[in-house]
A protein has these predicted regions:
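C-terminal and late-domain segments of enzyme folds
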Residues: 1-29, 39-47, 55-56, 134, ...
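Glycine/threonine-rich flexible loop motifs
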Residues: 94-103
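A short, aliphatic-rich alpha-helical micro-motif
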Residues: 78-82, 112
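Catalytic nucleophile loop
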Residues: 88-91, 111-133
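Conserved beta-strand elements of the Class I
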Residues: 33-35
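A short, well-structured beta->alpha microelement
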Residues: 62-78
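Short helix-loop-beta junction
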Residues: 51-64
Length: 242
């Protein structure tokens, strides 16, 4: 999910909760248990968001939200993933989220490979990638997006992410102007293309074709190569809401 605030949007979260319910039912649970992981840095995400994630999930269907909150600089205990049917990683300062989930990475990969539904919200979506865009607004001292979207970083910064999807992900695309960061990172060869997701919009990645839910678009960015494999440009298109 590319961010935004839509606590009453049943479409955005209904599929995720339904998949968690199927997984829970397989072990005899009538109500799915969903881990909600939140990292707070300088009161971001705000109390409204921290308290609102369970309500957003409930809009998608009956579930039990198990919320764990840590401060930036701290890490999650691996026990937060015990006996759950779904995992939501929330939004906030993206580098802090990647640091906080470090002890969970191998376990998350195994669980998702085994069918555990994963929902990344803003920062949680960005770190789901093989190579995660953590933030930044400059490439070689050249501005590539608004500084307000920099995540407390100057140069555009990447790191190994959770490895759940093989394309880079940026968020708040139309609202914060981060699409240009992904375009510039692709043209510079920092990433091999990816997607930038609008707010109140979800990209669903599963065994079938990619799907888009919500009110916005998912912007697909791909490098254009010459016969020698050198990047000569970037193509941009949208995956529209079905």
């Amino acid at each position: 999910v590319g961010g935004g605030w839509s606590p009453d949007d049943t479409e955005l979260y209904g599929l995720f909760v339904a998949e968690a319910a199927v997984r829970g039912a397989a072990v005899g649970r009538a109500v799915p248990r969903i881990a909600v992981l939140i990292v707070v840095a300088d009161d971001s995400p705000s109390a409204e968001f921290r308290d609102g994630y369970p309500a957003m999930l409930a809009a998608g269907g009956r579930c039990e939200a198990l919320t764990t909150i840590v401060a930036a600089g701290d890490e999650f205990d691996t026990r937060v993933l015990s006996d759950v049917d779904g995992l939501l990683v929330a939004g906030g300062l993206t580098p802090a989220y990647l640091d906080a989930v470090a002890p969970l990475i191998d376990q998350v990969r195994l669980l998702v490979a085994d069918g555990l539904p994963y929902l990344g919200f803003s920062a949680g979506a960005m770190i789901a990638a093989d190579r995660a865009v953590l933030g930044g607004w400059l490439i070689g001292d050249v501005p590539v997006c608004p500084e307000d979207a920099a995540e407390d970083l100057d140069e555009v910064t990447l790191a190994d992410g959770l490895g759940l999807v093989d394309l880079a992900i940026d968020v708040h695309a139309a609202q914060w102007g981060t699409l240009t960061r992904l375009i510039a990172a692709t043209e510079a060869g920092l990433v091999r293309g990816g997607v930038a997701i609008d707010e109140n919009t979800a990209l669903v990645v599963g065994e079938g074709a990619l799907a888009v839910l919500g009110t916005g678009s998912v912007w697909r960015v791909e490098p254009q190569l010459d016969d020698d494999g050198e990047i000569v440009g970037v193509s941009v298109g949208t995956l529209g809401v079905e």
